[in-house]
């Protein structure tokens, strides 16, 4: 059991641990590592994790993340967590391949690995995430129905991704494209915004200039950017996307987004910490993969999610 603790200015909490017994203070050290600390998606995940830690009373939880979505910076955060005495690392991998060697080294050092939201290639004890392929297909079907209901059966559609490596958003894109198979709609090549709202807005505006009638955002940043571009288009293009933040909900309420697929990051964080404690105690962890589900938020039900 590791006894040291990491004191870092950019960390917000405490930590998880790997072993059989708790540290001398009676707590297991758990590190939650997300892609950044900007998106409300990650804030809600930390809220859920902290709730579980407070309920259990034997978890020392630390939330750490790079300032931007970047593989090398996330690898550095993982290494800092290991050096700081992590027993368990809960991580949303920015890139499934890039981070895997660091996770392998962490595991070899005795750190237990749990994935939340976005897994890497290295095998973990458990993954708590959205079934992103299915959720992406649901987004596609929702948009397809909206267009068909308006008598629109063909046209160009743009897709804004985060990057080409993030497993979760790539799977959403694949599911979205599946929904439009065997239709007369043309789905253009995906453009990437690195989760940056301003960059996503520019991409969406370019799609509009290319004659797109709709645009799909695969995460919070790309969805906000898409919604802002739709607003500036005067409603000649429609948007649909992912995640639930105050800005996203406002865009839905005001009609710039016809719908968003709301994940449950708080559930991922909460159940991740519960899983970490069970792992430390040597208890059965159940299924290796848990789908934490999505809700479809539209203008009609948006107030229920505020």
Features from the language model and the residues they span:
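Short, low-complexity disordered leader/linker segments with a strong preference
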Residues: 1-29, 54, 82, 104-111, ...
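Hinge/cleft segment of the Venus flytrap/periplasmic-binding protein
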Residues: 24-27, 37, 156, 160-164, ...
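Hydrophobic alpha-helical segments within soluble ligand-binding/sensing domains
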Residues: 27, 74, 128-154, 198-201, ...
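Short, solvent-exposed amphipathic alpha-helices that sit
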Residues: 41-55, 135-142, 167-185, 225, ...
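Short beta-strand elements in bilobed, periplasmic/extracellular small-molecule ligand-binding domains
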Residues: 55-67, 156-161, 177-197
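Hydrophobic alpha-helical
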Residues: 78-108, 176, 189, 193-251
């Amino acid at each position: 059991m590791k006894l040291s603790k990491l004191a870092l200015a950019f960390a917000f909490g405490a930590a998880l641990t790997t072993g059989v017994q708790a540290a001398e203070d009676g707590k297991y050290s758990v590190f939650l590592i997300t892609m950044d600390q900007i998106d409300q998606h990650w804030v809600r995940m930390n809220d859920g994790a902290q709730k579980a830690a407070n309920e259990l009373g034997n978890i020392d939880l630390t939330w750490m993340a790079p300032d931007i979505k970047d593989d090398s910076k996330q690898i550095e955060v993982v290494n800092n967590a290991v050096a700081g005495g992590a027993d368990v690392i809960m991580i949303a991998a920015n890139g499934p391949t890039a981070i895997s060697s660091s996770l392998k080294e962490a595991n070899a050092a005795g750190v237990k690995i749990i994935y939340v939201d976005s897994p890497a290639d290295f095998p973990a004890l458990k993954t708590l995430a959205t079934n992103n392929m299915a959720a992406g297909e649901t987004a596609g079907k929702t948009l397809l129905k909206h267009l068909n209901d308006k008598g629109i059966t063909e046209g160009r559609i743009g897709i804004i991704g985060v990057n080409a490596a993030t497993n979760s958003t790539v799977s959403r894109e694949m599911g979205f494209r599946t929904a439009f198979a065997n239709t007369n709609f043309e789905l253009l090549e995906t453009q990437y915004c690195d989760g940056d709202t301003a960059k996503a807005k520019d991409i969406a505006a370019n799609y509009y200039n290319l004659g797109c009638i709709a645009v799909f955002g695969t995460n919070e940043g790309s969805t906000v950017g898409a919604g802002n571009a739709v607003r500036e288009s005067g409603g000649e293009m429609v948007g649909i996307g992912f995640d639930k933040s105050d800005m996203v909900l406002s865009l839905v309420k005001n009609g710039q987004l016809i719908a968003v697929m709301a994940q449950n990051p708080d559930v991922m964080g909460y159940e991740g910490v519960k899983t970490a404690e069970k792992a430390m105690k040597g208890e059965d962890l159940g299924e290796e993969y848990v789908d934490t589900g999505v809700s479809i938020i539209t203008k009609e039900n948006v107030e229920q999610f505020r």
